[in-house]
């Protein structure tokens, strides 16, 4: 099986891809057919803006990028909006969990120099809510710089250091690191 994910960025495109269907419990649910999972980028994640409201409405799994400006309180507010509590007898509910396991992925993009200080209080605050989000690390976007020739690039050692820091944070807290988030293409990329 192949599963795809993409940033739910273009409003008109995402609206055109909305369809009603049945969820695994047979209930009518709204889905975004543009991908199996859609995610919201760091710059479009206003909690009351279109992108977050769309993600709250659909039944797809959703991801949310969080950066170094994200506070623990903001992270908790996103979790409560995007993975709200459900009744114990609700279809798809798993006893002992708030929300729906697998519904929400928080993708940290902190940068190698901030991951070890900014991420721990966010993870601790979210874990304290009882929600079981998937934690991922995007080590590319927080480590971008412009080279002397004007191209955006990344230093591989910094990318690896951010990934290592991500796993160190989760090991120290006792939370589960769900993996890394890498955008890719089969083409050469110059930004």
Predicted regions and their residues:
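Active-site-facing alpha/beta catalytic cores
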Residues: 1-111, 151-154, 162-163, 176-183, ...
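Non-transmembrane, aqueous-exposed alpha-helical and coiled segments at domain scale
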Residues: 105-106, 110-137, 141-189
